[in-house]
Amino acid sequence: MDIEKITASLKNASSKLALQTASQKNEALLSVSSSIEKNRKIILEANALDVKNARERGMSESLVERLSLDDKKIDSIIDSFKLIISQTDPVGEEIAGWKTPAGMTIRQVRVPLGVVAIIYESRPNVTADAFALAYKSGNSILLRGSSSAINSNLALEKAIKQGLKNAKNGIDEAISLAPCKNHEEVEQILTAVGKVDVALPRGGAKLINMVVQTAKIPVIQTGAGICHLYVDESADLEMALNIAWNAKTQRPGACNAIETIVVNEKILNQFIPRLVEKFAGKVELRLDEK
């Protein structure tokens, strides 16, 4: 991987993107979402190949679920673009301001970071979501996904670039997908001081720890999951049951799916039987002695 060439192109793109108006960026994102829709069949075919290869290599079904795309997930990607387009442009927003005793006015203003690297695992939807968030906030993005999702990610990158080229002011150099041949590429990204401005790991604890320990560039560390739901004695129990069900079953393989439910002991006898009944045959419950 020619990290010098890739990052130079991304740096140039980020300089242009930082100067774009909200309407220019939104127009480009709308064009990209249309391109993903037009390329839906190609993206799903590429993903089917990744899933086939993963199963042949013996990947567990829980990991295959994370890797898989379907029409519903493509719809979700397109919906996320619409949501991001509808949001206020963060660039130039004044967060705080004050005047010093000496009469100097100081303002705290949001500005783009520059080149953002995302190191992530086998979820191809991250390719599209991360790009959209980066582009809206005026940043170019260097993506390094899992080798298991390479065909899906390449198809998504191609659709994104097509959408940017079709937009009047789109900057198609604002996205680059790093190859997935070996782990040396990840190290090249994480040690590209002055070329990559920040890295974000998106995955499990092992990946996050590797990024934090290897990086010589700034890292925004994310959570690794192990999500808890607490049900207090004052809770609406029907609402709590529905929240628990949704948080566990909507996407069980997602890192924000709950693993643990903590219940106030004063409502154990009221809540736990209803929880067992709702989850029966669908979710395995492992309860403590209480």
Question: What are the language-model segments listed below?
Answer:
Residues 1-105:
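N-terminal Rossmann-like NAD(P)+-binding subdomain of aldehyde/semialdehyde dehydrogenases
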Residues 2, 122-140, 159, 166, ...:
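ALDH superfamily catalytic-core signature
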Residues 86, 90-163, 215-219, 226:
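Conserved small-residue-rich beta-alpha loop and adjacent elements
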Residues 95-102, 180-182, 242-244:
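Short gly/ser/thr-rich secondary-structure transition/capping motifs
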Residues 114, 197, 259:
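Conserved acidic residues
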Residues 147-222, 227-241:
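Phosphate/pyrophosphate-binding betaalpha-module
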